[in-house]
Amino acid sequence: MGVFVKMATDSFNVGELALYRGLFAVVVLGVWVLCSHHSFATKHLKEHLLRSLCGTISFLLWFVSLTLIPLSTAMTLGNATPLCMAAIVVIYGLVKKRPTSLVLVCSAIAGFGGVLMIFSPDTNVNLVGAAFALGSSLVTAGSYIQIKALSRLKEPVWRTVFYFSIVNVILGAMLDFCLPETSLETSVGWRDILSLLGMGACGLAAQLCVTRAFDRSNMLVSTILSYSVIVFGILFGFIFFGDAIDLWMVAGTAVIIVTGVISTMSVKKLEEDPDSLL
């Protein structure tokens, strides 16, 4: 999806990207629900709205980062969510005066050390774009916590993704209205249309898969496999956009992946604690 978003940023603003991304999913899921006679109704609207707001804000931040930094960097920093979750759990433990895993603390610190390696002067990273990508990871951590909460409430995966997509459309349209320039003022070609369709299809498939994975509680396996996105991001960035592969970038990415896996293993142990944030 990141490749299609990166391609579309030349012709569409961030609001439009969020709008079209959500619209594709709303149409596809809406038709499926009507044909299969499922119900859109839910008893947990507040939980859906909170998850959808976190998810949409996360994507908006990530879309902005893609306009400022290379795809590989945006993928790496945008997938530092386990480190952000570790930081949240550590802070939560300190506030509640509860014992915190030393492994979790060390892995979080080391992971953010990997982030600093990516910020090395040799990598020439746009700090504003990197900040947006990291902000996306932080908000995504909150979104994942809400997905877990919805799974405990036995909400179906498709309904979680459907409400998320509706909020995509609403916030995207509002942001597009506030931004001065839209795609309607520029020439939109087949390449742009195909980019939007690719973004929508990949985005819908990814959301269904991620939500299903967390719904089945395979948090550790899901997180480890999700790091393959970073590898693909580096390769696709090099192939499609000519992004340079820097030694500091590779080293920092490796540190983030390793510490992210360790953080996830530590966080996984906390899920059994009834007083845990997770």
What are these regions (language model features)?
Residues 11-57, 85-88, 139-143, 163-180, ...:
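Transmembrane alpha-helices of multi-pass small-molecule transport proteins
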Residues 88, 100-120, 248-267:
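Hydrophobic transmembrane alpha-helices of multi-pass small-molecule transport proteins
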Residues 227-278:
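C-terminal-most transmembrane helix of multi-pass membrane proteins
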Residues 3-6, 29, 122-181, 277-278:
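Transmembrane alpha-helical segments that form core, pore/gating elements
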Residues 74-80, 155-167, 204-238:
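Helix-helix packing/entry segments at the starts of transmembrane helices
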Residues 38-63, 103, 128-136, 176, ...:
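Loop-to-transmembrane-helix transition segments
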Residues 82-103, 231-250:
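C-terminal transmembrane-helix exit sites in multi-pass transporters
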Residues 1-12, 17-20, 60-71, 77-80, ...:
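Juxtamembrane C-cap of transmembrane helices in multi-pass membrane transport proteins
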